[in-house]
A protein has these predicted regions:
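Short hydrophobic/aromatic residue motifs in ordered secondary structure
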Residues: 51-53, 142, 258, 286
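Short glycine-rich anion-binding loops that position phosphate/pyrophosphate groups of nucleotides
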Residues: 193-195
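Primarily NTPase-proximal linker/entry elements flanking Walker-type ATP/GTP-binding cores
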Residues: 17-138, 145-166, 173-181, 185-190
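Short acidic DE-rich linear segments
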Residues: 1-4, 307-312
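Short amphipathic alpha-helical/adjacent loop interface patches that line ligand
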Residues: 11, 15, 122, 206, ...
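Conserved catalytic-core segment of NTP-binding enzymes
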Residues: 148, 168-183, 197-303
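Charged, compositionally biased N-terminal leader segments and the immediate start
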Residues: 1-25
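Residue-level signature of catalytic and energy-coupling elements of molecular machines
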Residues: 11, 48-50, 109, 139, ...
Length: 312
């Protein structure tokens, strides 16, 4: 099964949650008026699209309806789909780190699939013939994280730099940077601790890591990706808010998109924070993590044919 098919299947619950509601609004009104827009607004917000994104999407839709002189609600559906796609467009430089010597930090609470995402991202980059090192792990307080990364190293062929459980995370990064330079690696992927309970400690830890990178590899391109579990819905927004206070988040990996009713969160996040979703995960295999593409995502959500992308 191609990635688009998997994504479409994975978004079934989200589709039932959002799209069936949208369709009933379109079919339940005979004219486009304030009541129509109010009903559509409520449906989008209830579907985890979020208040900010919903307002922006509806403002855009109203303009398009006016420009195109549309009277029939059923004719709005494609315009709504187009508005959502535009809202989620990443722009030109979303994956600039692939073209540079880079350090990519993966950040997030424990249990969201952070270490697995490091492994899958390593697999994606290895498939582009990049030389990849995984810092295994800056999350040195969780022995299982090191075992997991070792397993991913075996599966993907990416190198791993590991120290014993309880080592200083900044020291792990220091060793990993030295290995990066010696082995002429393209990308260093860093797993980080997921403890938000004590924000002060986490901030200090991330600052220490930043200082090491700044001192040892200042010309490296930096990317800080937060890993969020799509099944947590609005809770994912809270996590992003908390971590964004601690460090500069540049992108999002949205995991567990297969089987969640809360996939609308992908739209909400980008509108509310202006931080792009860069990867989405729909399963356990390496190829089940893919670059985010707004057309592919929205087509899968609305069950629209994705043309030649069917087996991406």
């Amino acid at each position: 099964m191609g990635f688009f098919s998997k994504l479409k299947e994975g978004l079934t619950k989200t589709r039932d949650n959002i799209v069936s509601g949208i369709d009933s609004v379109f079919s339940g009104f005979s004219s486009i008026d304030d009541d129509f827009y109010d009903e559509l607004e409520e449906t989008l917000i209830m579907g985890d699209i979020g208040v900010v994104a919903t307002e922006e999407i509806l403002d855009d839709l109203k303009n398009k309806v006016k420009e195109n002189k549309i009277k029939n609600p059923a004719d709005c559906k494609q315009l709504l789909i187009d508005s959502i796609k535009e809202k989620m467009n990443l722009g030109e430089n979303a994956y600039e780190f692939e073209n540079r010597k880079s350090i990519v930090m993966l950040i997030g609470v424990n249990g969201v699939g952070k270490t697995t995402s490091v492994g899958k991202l390593a697999g994606l980059l290895k498939a582009q013939n990049k030389k990849v090192i995984m810092a295994g792990a800056a999350d040195t307080f969780r022995a299982a994280a090191i075992e997991q990364l070792t397993e991913w190293s075996n599966r993907t062929g990416a190198d791993i730099i590991a120290q014993s459980e309880g080592s200083d995370p900044a020291a792990v990064i220091y060793d990993s940077i030295a290995a990066c330079k010696a082995r002429k690696a393209d990308v260093l992927l860093c797993d980080t601790a997921g403890r938000l309970q004590n924000k002060k400690n986490l901030m200090e830890e991330l600052r220490k890591i930043d200082r090491v990178i700044e001192r040892e590899y200042s010309d490296a391109y930096r990317e800080n990706l937060i890993v969020l579990d799509a099944t947590t819905g609005q809770n994912a927004l809270s996590q992003l808010r908390e971590f964004n206070d601690v460090t500069n988040i540049t992108g999002i990996i949205l995991t567990k998109m297969d089987g969640t009713a809360k996939g609308g969160i992908a739209v909400a996040i980008q509108a509310e924070f202006g931080i792009p979703v860069k990867y989405i995960g729909v399963g356990e295999k390496v190829e089940d993590l893919q670059k985010f593409d707004s057309d592919t995502f929205v087509n899968a959500l609305f069950d629209v044919d994705n043309g030649s992308d069917e087996d991406r």
